[in-house]
Amino acid sequence: MVEEEGMRSLERADLAGYAARSCRSRGRMHPEEFRDDRPAFERDRDRIIHCAAFRRLEYKTQVFVNHEGDYYRTRLTHSLEVAQIGKAIARRLALNEELTEALALAHDLGHTPFGHTGEEVLNRLMEGFGGFEHNLQSFRVVDQLEERYPGFNGLNLSWEVLEGIIKHSSPYDRPTGLIEGFLPGVVPTIEAQIINFADEIAYNNHDIDDGLKSGYITIEQLNGVDLWREVWERIDTAHPGLDRERKKFQTISALIGLLIRDLITATEANLRAYGVSTLDDVRRVNRPLVTFSSAMEERNRSLKRFLFTNLYRHHKVERMRVKAERYLTQLFESYVKHPTLLPRKYQQKMDTLGRERVVCDYIAGMTDRFALDEFKRLFEPYERV
């Protein structure tokens, strides 16, 4: 890894001792000459924002397929919400906000079209060829698949960003050659740990909003969940007579704030309990330091169970899952059987990467809209090719 110099003066002076710092980064894989003195993690964030994979997140779904309505969250809006929540937590813990933001914006770059259904389909189809997992695909995107710079593929991000992407929401000892050199079996920076929870806070609460908007779940159902009911009643007491729509937004906002405050308090207690004062201490302790309190963890688990049963397994969501499986399976099988259907630059990679992996990369990079259009072009007789 190549180190960068001259960044210390532009980085916040009040960062905690256990925060990651650009000036102490393990560097980048490829040497580069920079024309400005941005700190390394700020540069990483900027590269992520400007890459093609980030723009495609606008048309990749969370729960609702993109064409079902302009209101619903996409992977792009979700990533922005994760960044906002993550930075709010990082600021209060005196952590590196630029690293936190870079990780938030990159954490879903490897996601497939059609949400987690797409990931499940590709993992099944890639059995025997290395499988598919979206965190590792995010790594492939920033390490290999983006083609923007002379002399190397990928975005040439800092070591700490790559480590955080690989270890996002997952066991830290993944048995894969991808993380050799990224401390397998060791927890990542606290900034990376924050993103695991910012991700969860964002998608749980915003799936509630989208679920209510769609009519797939109701306030009456949610009031059976202790955590939601407590906040809903608090808003009702504070704002008597408030209309239902405003009350919903205020409840979601207050719930996000409640979860953030609990997370910060529990994390501060963990840092004190384990005597963590440096980043080396974070590695030495080698257990997650960012957590909810045990009480909040259980209450939040009940909310997640509710969403799984009532929203993610709603019959209309299930119908879209079945359709998505069909689209992606038929596309994959057709491309593997007839690789000349792929753009030439993908065909040229097959001798090196293997036909199945190239097809997998191509499909994983699709938006919902492109996948639907491609399915029509290949399988509907009156559709223009």
Swiss-Prot record:
Disulfide bonds: none annotated. Residues 75-204 form the HD domain. Keywords: Hydrolase. InterPro entries: dGTPase, dGTPase-like, dNTPase_2, HD/PDEase_dom, HD_domain, PHydrolase_assoc_dom. SMART domains: HDc (SM00471). Pfam families: HD (PF01966), HD_assoc (PF13286). GO terms for molecular function: dGTPase activity. GO terms for biological process: dGTP catabolic process. Belongs to the dGTPase family. Type 2 subfamily. This is Deoxyguanosinetriphosphate triphosphohydrolase-like protein. It comes from Geobacter sulfurreducens (strain ATCC 51573 / DSM 12127 / PCA).
